[in-house]
Amino acid sequence: MIWGVLMMGILLPQCSAHPGFFTSIGQMTDLIHNEKDLVTSLKDYIKAEEDKLEQIKKWAEKLDRLTSTATKDPEGFVGHPVNAFKLMKRLNTEWSELENLILKDMSDGFISNLTIQRQYFPNDEDQVGAAKALFRLQDTYNLDTNTISKGNLPGVKHKSFLTAEDCFELGKVAYTEADYYHTELWMEQALMQLEEGEMSTVDKVSVLDYLSYAVYQQGDLDKALLLTKKLLELDPEHQRANGNLVYFEYIMSKEKDANKSASGDQSDQKTTPKKKGIAVDYLPERQKYEMLCRGEGIKMTPRRQKRLFCRYHDGNRNPKFILAPAKQEDEWDKPRIIRFHDIISDAEIEIVKDLAKPRLSRATVHDPETGKLTTAQYRVSKSAWLSGYEDPVVSRINMRIQDLTGLDVSTAEELQVANYGVGGQYEPHFDFARKDEPDAFRELGTGNRIATWLFYMSDVSAGGATVFPEVGASVWPKKGTAVFWYNLFASGEGDYSTRHAACPVLVGNKWVSNKWLHERGQEFRRPCTLSELE
């Protein structure tokens, strides 16, 4: 390929407004049932075609026997009045019936069903979203392409493999997004599987075409040249590869000339020593976030761990919890993160999920510039809002939060239910509005988000932790539990250590619901202090 002269282009159709199946595992399960219905319809069509062919075969066998007998003595055969009548009948009527049978389209029912179902099919946005989710999981959990291709993921119940064609398609998605790092990884995986003898509709020439370009874009000219030569061994007439071979050799020649003319003796130059490992505390946030998602990173000292306790909590002598107090566990000290165990029943969870499912839509975030809600690539999930007036269970859950936190829920936001899709995540963010976002919650008129209550409504096979990169805390999903923390100090100042994230779901289905409690109504429940950081 002559890059800049000959460029490969992959044009995807424009995506129309679409529900975005890839953002919700819950809605993707509906697709499984839809596909099962289509398979049943397809099998019915195949059976109808087989029955039709069986009838035609019987006709052919009968007529073969009849004509074989008739052709031995044609005059004698038609000399029989019955044979003469039946010959007229066959040619005038029965062959027409056979023609109608052959022309009968047995696919009408299947095509009609397929047409109806197709309007609910995923589109290009979903396919690209699912592919990018695989890339995200690959990076976050340090998974190599071969591990993913072989289906060797932790906690999987149903092992699934990727074909060379699948790997090629993933590489093409990365290419379309100008993500040449993942293009290289997945094209190399496709090439490896082809070289191992896997039968595929994809050929090595096509894979090498993309692979050499991805490698070139990342600055590895030597490897790009090597791959181009390998492509030309398979297809010496490949026009783009021949052009690119000349281009690569020209660029390499220019670089060699530039190196020769460079001043100074290369042998006298000192090599720059490699940087030593950086302490975890000083790693950029993205690295800390990914390490915490993998269960690595900062570990709490034994001295701090001794300050964490489990206890029974009665909600400050609340009558509802005196005889059956809530089980409370300290997950972290600063910020203080508390987990409540067995705080929501399976029956309540199912009711909340059933209420939320019909109205799940792509989760939104507050745009700091406009103050309005908008979708974002760093939040991949679907959510729905439930009011306490809709169902007694929702009202009961709201009151339980009030009883256990001591905070007024009348000024809180509605219960938000979220279901995470393939690689579903919510990258590091604050729940509270910062000083440069004065209008974030102005429409609500209830002040800033003072605290967050988060229910875990499912177990997750792998991944899906809630992590706090600033302090190194990781809280893992456990069905029936909830975690609680304050976003603001008692002074009303934001606690920046509460910056947190929802790690990508590696395997499984993650359901959560959260309640954001606001400042209004808490004046006497959580009095303001004079110290800014208390």
Swiss-Prot record:
Single GO MF annotation: iron ion binding
Cofactor note: Binds 1 Fe(2+) ion per subunit.
S-S bridge residues: none
Location in the cell: Endoplasmic reticulum lumen
Reaction(s) the record says it catalyses: L-prolyl-[collagen] + 2-oxoglutarate + O2 = trans-4-hydroxy-L-prolyl-[collagen] + succinate + CO2
Residues of the Fe2OG dioxygenase domain: 411-519
Residues the record marks as carrying a glycan: 113, 259
Chief site of localization: endoplasmic reticulum
GO biological process: collagen fibril organization
Protein name from the UniProt record: Prolyl 4-hydroxylase subunit alpha-1
Organism (species): Rattus norvegicus (Rat)
Lineage: Eukaryota, Metazoa, Chordata, Craniata, Vertebrata
